[in-house]
Amino acid sequence: MEPESNQGPETAPEAASALPIPIMEPVPAAERISALDVLRGCALLGILLMNILAFGLPVAAYLNPTVAGGSSGPNLAAWLIQYVFLDGKMRALFSLCFGAGVILLTSRGEKRGAGIGIADVYYRRTLWLLLFGILHAYLIWFGDILYPYALCGLVLFPFRKLSPRFLLITAALLVAVLTGMSIWQGYQFREMRSEALEAEREAKAGRKLTREHEEAKKEWEDVLKDIQPPPDEVKKEIDDYRGSYLSALKRRAQMTMRWHSKPFYFPGMADMYALMLIGMAFMKKDVLTAERSWRFYFAMALLGYLLGLPVNALAAWQSIQVNFEPVRLPFIFATYHFGRVAVALAHLAVIMMVVKAGALGWLTRRLAAVGQMAFSNYISHSLICSLVFYGYGLGMFARFERYQLYFVVALIWLFNLVWSPIWLRHFHFGPLEWCWRSLTYWKRQPMRIRKELAMTHIIGETSP
């Protein structure tokens, strides 16, 4: 997550010798890369379309609509649209922005004479993001993205000097590895189910299960918990989230510890890292600033949709045909990473064309404000949703059907689009961006915009 990557860093006392005074100045409005802000804003709001499912329904329903939330009529249609157009695509755009932010932060610092001293600022920023992510995951919502982004950020810094070609090739190799892992996982699931069924037959025959049989049975049960959990497990999850803050905290802690473990984390980390590398390459080639030609963006959009949408639609149709059977899904979803990257890049191209054309200015200005406050808005999603769905709030967990959750999304979008530009009329940063920056430099940063700057800001927003 890189919500303030479009602004120059400000110097901490301990880094003053390495970072010259100009870096202390906030980046003037004229220097903002608004296209990147708009892209980040679109990605952030789009991510909520997916995250709302994990906020409002049992976690297995995110992938498998037969678990909860309805799997027919408008609910199945909602799942279908979600999978084909959105699932993983919005996160991909957000990861692109994070990678671009690495290039922005480091290149601006180095151009202003910071040299390798920018590494000090970069790693302090990243470590604070890591801490924010841990707190967010355990205290508010297990589906946190800050922690894995920070982990990726720790190893992104050395890649900043590499050529766009090398970055893109590395990203393509990671996507290929992830595709191979999905196929391998399918064979693993098939073998695990076979061994679990054998253990079940042994138990029914009254024979004592071996250690291998016990392990096979448990491994398969763990797989089903994530894709097709038994009704009693679903009910327990619902009860936990509708209960007290403590019961929800215990459930969150269990999920977070599982998701932070190696088996769950490597595919997700590689997925994010690949897109961050693409973002770094695209930033170097001016793709994310709407500076490439119309032909370039049109070709990217056309090719991305032509390649990605049919692949995604076929996988969705096959999933429905097998009724989301766990053993079949890894084979069906083998094309997931290819399809999501293709469609995400097409979405990117469309957004860049809108910005380039100067169309929908009333909306893009608000999206840019949402993007500039991405950290604050991201956490606002978690706070609002936890109060709507969990027992220490309204307790609406698992009470909405899948399609109905999107009405909640619309209200949160409205809040972000209204609140963000109003806040930025008066302050340089969002509240959490300011906190993050102050912690990074271990010095309270200027927050309020001076009156003359505020007037310029307002005039700029109201001008055509």
Model-based region annotation:
Residues 2-464:
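Alpha-helical transmembrane segments and their immediate juxtamembrane cytosolic regions
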